[in-house]
Amino acid sequence: MDLASKLFKGDRVIWVIFMFLCLVSVIEVFSATSTIAYKNANHWAPIVRHATFLLGGFVLVLLMHNIPCRFYSLLSLLLPVSMVLLAITPFVGVVVNGEPRWLEILGIRFQPSEIAKIAAIGYTAFILSKRNWFTDKQMFWYILGGVGGVCFLIFFNNGSTAILLFAVTFMMMFIGQISIGRLLRLGGAGIIGVLMLVGFIRFAPDKVIDLMPDRVHTWKARIERFSDPADAVKFEPGRAVSIDGDDYQVVHAKIALARGGLFGKFPGHGQQRDFLPQAYSDFIYAIIIEEMGIVGGVFVLLLYIILLVRVGMIARRCDKLFPKFLVLGCGLLVVVQALTNMAVAVDLIPVTGQPLPLVSRGGTSTVISCAYIGIILSVSRFGANMGNEEETPEEEAALNFIQAVKDMKARFGIGDTCLLYTSDAADDK
C-alpha cells in the first residue's frame, strides 16, 4: 500500500473535490486580496494567513477521517456549550466590521456561530437516529427546541446564518421522516414569519428602525436595494451614475460577471477585485467568473453539486441511522451555503454575507468547513460500503484471523480436514 493510500482513506471522489476547491481557493484568494496586500505593504501576508488556515484544515481532515464516525455523536454535547458562547458574544465579543460576532480566548479568535452550526448538525443527527428512544413528536420538539434556540441566538447578529441552519435542519427532519403535518406547519410558520419580518423592515418608518439593533439597518438597506425597481433605469447608456452606498458591491459584482465572458481574464488579471470590499469572501464567486470565465464558474458549481450527489450515495449505503443523517447534514450545509453565496454573487437574492465554503478567505469558517469534509470522509470509510479498496476494521480483523489460522496450520502440520471442521463449526454459530 503506497503513501497516498495510507493517508487519503475514505471516498476518493470527496478527496478530489476537496483538493480542487482548496486549489481554487489558494489561486483566487491570492488574487482577490490584492487590496489588503497593498494596504499592509506586504504582498504575501494575506495569502500566507489563508494558506495557514487551509493547511490546518487539511491536517484536521486527515485526523477526523481516521476517527470512526460513531464518535461524532459527541458533537451533540457541544450544543449547550455553543449556546452559552452565543449568549455572551454580544457582551464580550470582539467587534469586526461593526458586529460583535467573534470571541477571543487565549489569543485565539473564533466565531461561535460556526461551532454552533456543526454542533446543531451532530445534535439533529443524533436525535433522528434514536427512533427506539423517542417518539416522532418527541424528536420533533427536541430538535426544534435545541436548534431553534441556537438559531434564535444567532439571528440578530447574523440572520442569514440562522435561516441557513434552520433550513438544513428542516431538510434533515424531512429526510428523517418526521411527521409531514408537523413539518408543514413548521415550514409554513417559518415562511410567514420571514415574509412578515421582511415586509416590516422594508416598509417601517426610519424612526422605528432607528430604535432597533444596528443590524436591522443593514437588513433594511439590503432589502431596499434588492427590491428597488429603478435599478435598471439608473444605468441607461450614456448616463453618468455615481456607484456608491448599498449599490456598490452588487454593481461591481455585476461588472465582474460581465467582464468574465466564456474563459475569463485569467487569474490575477481581474479588475473588480480592487473595488469589491469583500472580493475574497462574500463575492469571491464573482471574481472567479471574472478571472476564470463561465467555464470556471460552472466548474466550481459542479464541484459542489457532485459533492452533494456523492454524499447522497454515501448516505444510501449507511447501515446505521446516525452516520446516514450526519453525512447528509454536513453535505447539505456545505452545498446550501455554497449555492447561497453564488446566488448573491449573480444577484438572485439579497446580500447575505455567507462565504463560499472551502474557497472564501476565512479563519473559523475555513477550519469548520474542513471539519465537515473530515466527517463526510469518516462516514464514507467507517459507516458506508462505498466499494473502496481498503477493508473496514471488522473485515481487516477477520482477514488477520484467517491468516493466523493458516500460519498455525503450516507450523503444526494441521490437515485440511481439521481446518474445514473449524470453519464449519464457526459457520454453525
Give names to the regions the model predicted.
Residues 151-156, 262, 340, 346-355, ...:
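Transmembrane alpha-helix interface/packing and boundary motifs in multi-pass membrane proteins
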Residues 15, 19, 26, 31, ...:
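Hydrophobic alpha-helical transmembrane segments of multi-pass inner membrane proteins, especially
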Residues 421-429:
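Conserved small/polar residues in nucleotide/adenosyl-binding loops
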Residues 4-17:
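N-terminal membrane topogenic signal
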Residues 23, 347-391:
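Transmembrane alpha-helices of multi-pass inner-membrane enzymes
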Residues 244, 249-295:
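Long extracytoplasmic/lumenal interhelical loops at the membrane interface
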